[in-house]
Amino acid sequence: MGVLHTISESPCALAELCDRTGLPRATAYRLAAALEVHRLLARDDEGRWCLGPAVTELASRVNDPLLAASAAVLPTLRETTDESVQLYRREGTSRVCVAALEPSSGLRDTVPVGARLPMTAGSGAKVLLAHSDAATQKVVLPGAQFTDRTLAEVRRRGWAQSVAEREPGVASVSAPVRDSRGVVIAAISVSGPIDRMGRRPGARWAADLLAAAEAITRRL
């Protein structure tokens, strides 16, 4: 946090960051580089660190009802499945991870909060695209690893699954989260290694995903 606060005052390069924080050069670089990976820091035209886009994104969610509602549900889902859980929102033709929790041990499918993923692969993408407008579907589907028939099946069944679509060796299952009017506003997901999730992850976890999605809706 000290590095973030320092750079929020004015952009700076490594030498100045060390002077202003009192941190050793290696430590300052390691911390700043890690923050840059998570988009909390970025580089300006002069190569100096400055605040990154994730800071604004996080600030906009401080009073976000969806995140407040999901905070009471995601931990239970993680304990039930012992896998990684995420919450995604659609932004244009991408999806953004707005909340994520990891299991305490074992291999994980880590998706950082703020990560922007394509809508062309993965169960979360299928759920969000299945409930998107026709114009968005028309743009995304030509490059997707699924078809409009897949989306119709997602709407009929109420959930989606994927195996090695977004990333080799990873399987996932997702369900839509609706607001009080019934409009889909997010996708809740469970993901993990295929060796644990299996090649039909929906058969194992879809019911729990649907219950978690409904629990979030009730809290909105």
Segments from the language model and where they lie:
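N-terminal helix-turn-helix
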Residues: M1-D64, R218-R219
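Short amphipathic alpha-helical signal-transduction/dimerization elements
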Residues: S8, L129-D133, L210-T217
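Short hydrophobic/aromatic beta-strand element in the GNAT-like acyltransferase core
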Residues: L40, C97, S174
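Amphipathic alpha-helical effector-binding/dimerization core
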Residues: C50-V139
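Conserved GNAT-family N-acetyltransferase fold
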Residues: V85, A175, I188
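Juxtadomain coupling helices with adjacent low-complexity linkers
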Residues: G143-A152, R156-A160, P168, A186-L220
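A short beta-strand signature within small-molecule sensing/ligand-binding domains used
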Residues: P168-P176
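Flexible loop/coil segments at beta-strand boundaries within sensory signal-transduction domains
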Residues: R178-V184
